Amino acid sequence: MSDDQFHHPPPPSSMRHRSTSDAADGGCGEIVEVQGGHIVRSTGRKDRHSKVCTAKGPRDRRVRLSAHTAIQFYDVQDRLGFDRPSKAVDWLIKKAKTSIDELAELPPWNPADAIRLAAANAKPRRTTAKTQISPSPPPPQQQQQQQQLQFGVGFNGGGAEHPSNNESSFLPPSMDSDSIADTIKSFFPVIGSSTEAPSNHNLMHNYHHQHPPDLLSRTNSQNQDLRLSLQSFPDGPPSLLHHQHHHHTSASASEPTLFYGQSNPLGFDTSSWEQQSSEFGRIQRLVAWNSGGGGGATDTGNGGGFLFAPPTPSTTSFQPVLGQSQQLYSQRGPLQSSYSPMIRAWFDPHHHHQSISTDDLNHHHHLPPPVHQSAIPGIGFASGEFSSGFRIPARFQGQEEEQHDGLTHKPSSASSISRH
């Protein structure tokens, strides 16, 4: 058997045609009629991706063999002397033609059916698109939280998203007086020494009585700078308290106040103390006069003293937290305290007038030790002795200066402290 019998002549050009069916347009490729059947050439791809039309539909043009079958086949091809594997396959088919004819017949092959099957197998691969799963919209509550995070709590986000907010503020609109009281209490705890502290309701009740009702609205309209500062007062705070008696002489008018200095070691913001006269009237005052004699050395040695006792928590001012910026935040001191620095220093007007009398010009002033009250707990200066057992001198430095010009002397230890 010659080798030429296994080579099929190429089909005429008239047998080659493009399929005009819908299946062919779906991407099956070009159907080419060849001797003994049809092949489906893949359009735009290599020939090895083409399909052959069989009775059961298109199949791969290249047949994959197992390892041991491929070894045996290549041995037969080499023994036949063929240069192509297809020639060796044709020789095997012709030799087994009798056995092949004894097999059952296959159903007739219809090219249209093969094209439809090829299109059905290829169309899902071509038309299947990647479906993008769009995230479901968040619930309304989550949308509102996202808007608050985007635009800021209490800030106007442009008008459409927050139509109810007409002004910007650092306080959320839902904050009421109770939440403000809890917040203030957490940052500025109110500590009572001997009396039981009242409830938050009473504190806020007294606070609203002491301050105008539109305090929160003014706070919302003005962006307060609540940061603490370490700056000191350049010229010292204003007078902590004007003397209650206006009939004092020039000596008492020029009397220095307690802890008044250029550096202001306590660092209290006192820019609005003079304006809060109504609040000063509510502060309890405890004045204890020395029961000793009028010109003895005991009175001279005691001098003046200061007792700082905590007032009732109801009189504690919350102005360092909430208040008008033009009053409370015009000057900032180091780490303002939650207690109102109501430090007062005054002297007995009766004894003071006796001390400046013309009969005692060459003697020392005999001033009783006044006891003063402040909002700072735990600090006490009373006649040179602490209530807790600590004892300090009545005057911190120096001795009482004698009067040389016949006008004034240093009245007490308060003046010595205030000048340093």
Curated annotation (Swiss-Prot):
<feature type="compositionally biased region" description="Polar residues">
    <location>
        <begin position="410"/>
        <end position="420"/>
    </location>
</feature>
<feature type="region of interest" description="Disordered">
    <location>
        <begin position="121"/>
        <end position="176"/>
    </location>
</feature>
<dbReference type="Pfam" id="PF03634">
    <property type="entry name" value="TCP"/>
</dbReference>
<keyword id="KW-0238">DNA-binding</keyword>
<feature type="region of interest" description="Disordered">
    <location>
        <begin position="399"/>
        <end position="420"/>
    </location>
</feature>
<dbReference type="GO" id="GO:0048366">
    <property type="term" value="P:leaf development"/>
</dbReference>
<dbReference type="InterPro" id="IPR017887">
    <property type="entry name" value="TF_TCP_subgr"/>
</dbReference>
<keyword id="KW-0805">Transcription regulation</keyword>
<comment type="subunit">
    <text>Interacts with AHL27 and AHL29. Interacts with SPL. Interacts with JGB. Interacts with GI (via N-terminus).</text>
</comment>
<comment type="function">
    <text>Transcription factor playing a pivotal role in the control of morphogenesis of shoot organs by negatively regulating the expression of boundary-specific genes such as CUC genes, probably through the induction of miRNA (e.g. miR164). Required during early steps of embryogenesis. Participates in ovule development. Activates LOX2 expression by binding to the 5'-GGACCA-3' motif found in its promoter. Activates YUC5 transcription by binding to the 5'-GTGGGCCA-3' motif found in its promoter.</text>
</comment>
<keyword id="KW-0217">Developmental protein</keyword>
<feature type="domain" description="TCP">
    <location>
        <begin position="45"/>
        <end position="103"/>
    </location>
</feature>
<dbReference type="InterPro" id="IPR005333">
    <property type="entry name" value="Transcription_factor_TCP"/>
</dbReference>
<feature type="region of interest" description="Disordered">
    <location>
        <begin position="353"/>
        <end position="379"/>
    </location>
</feature>
<dbReference type="GO" id="GO:0003700">
    <property type="term" value="F:DNA-binding transcription factor activity"/>
</dbReference>
<protein>
    <recommendedName>
        <fullName>Transcription factor TCP4</fullName>
    </recommendedName>
</protein>
<dbReference type="GO" id="GO:0048825">
    <property type="term" value="P:cotyledon development"/>
</dbReference>
<dbReference type="GO" id="GO:0010150">
    <property type="term" value="P:leaf senescence"/>
</dbReference>
<dbReference type="GO" id="GO:0005634">
    <property type="term" value="C:nucleus"/>
</dbReference>
<dbReference type="GO" id="GO:0006355">
    <property type="term" value="P:regulation of DNA-templated transcription"/>
</dbReference>
<dbReference type="GO" id="GO:0001216">
    <property type="term" value="F:DNA-binding transcription activator activity"/>
</dbReference>
<feature type="region of interest" description="Disordered">
    <location>
        <begin position="228"/>
        <end position="256"/>
    </location>
</feature>
<keyword id="KW-0539">Nucleus</keyword>
<dbReference type="GO" id="GO:0009793">
    <property type="term" value="P:embryo development ending in seed dormancy"/>
</dbReference>
<dbReference type="GO" id="GO:1990837">
    <property type="term" value="F:sequence-specific double-stranded DNA binding"/>
</dbReference>
<keyword id="KW-0804">Transcription</keyword>
<dbReference type="GO" id="GO:0048826">
    <property type="term" value="P:cotyledon morphogenesis"/>
</dbReference>
<feature type="region of interest" description="Disordered">
    <location>
        <begin position="1"/>
        <end position="27"/>
    </location>
</feature>
<dbReference type="GO" id="GO:0003677">
    <property type="term" value="F:DNA binding"/>
</dbReference>
